Amino acid sequence: KIAENMHYNQFVPYTDRLDYLAPLANNVAYACAVEKLMGWELPPRGQALRVLCCELARISAHMLGVGVCAMDVGAMTVFLYTFTEREKVYNLCEQLTGARFTTSYTRVGGQLRDMPPGFAAAVRTFLVECEVAIGEIAKLLDNNKIFRDRMVDIGVISRESAISYGMTGPNLRASGVDRDLRKCSPYLGYEKYDFDVPIADEGDCYARYQIRMEEMRQSIKICRQVLDTMPDGVIVLDHSGKV
């Protein structure tokens, strides 16, 4: 209702608040919807920047999920690992956008600004460090008897229940539903990147943990491909119309 009295880009900051703990990706769905209605196609570099932002946000969100889950079942050390990596994502957010949480970086028709000098190198450094951290987390949790006792066969959600509840994302895929919009209905050029969509059939807490761990690995893989193939050119459409 608020958006009805705004210019389309004035509404972007409101979408930040949908999940301010995983910034960068929050504006994308709204911007993509407006662009689709207008029949606009983003410049290749603008699309690649959005993919990079979305995958960094995915890593940040999953680090929160894994860390808090581990702490809730008694694995405090893992929480320290995950929040260290999330802090690095926030540092990247600040370097790219000037803000750590409510970034308002996406614009209808492109992005607010291009990558600053040194940003790509900083992302590559983070990806290496994050990959190491994921390995350490896996060592601490994957075969930990106490962790498994508190996660395996707990909170089981069947495939049918997951669908009927309208579940999405990693929780849906942990219940055996092979659905990821990046694969089944690609946007922003996701079809150009090589990555897997992890699926589990158990539908329990441990499966949901495993899905998030593997999705972070796949996000790292995507981010590297984005940086390796980043096209030149503009990051925003040259348009003067109003929606």
Where do the model's predicted regions map?
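Metal/cofactor-centered catalytic core regions of large enzymes
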Residues: 1-243
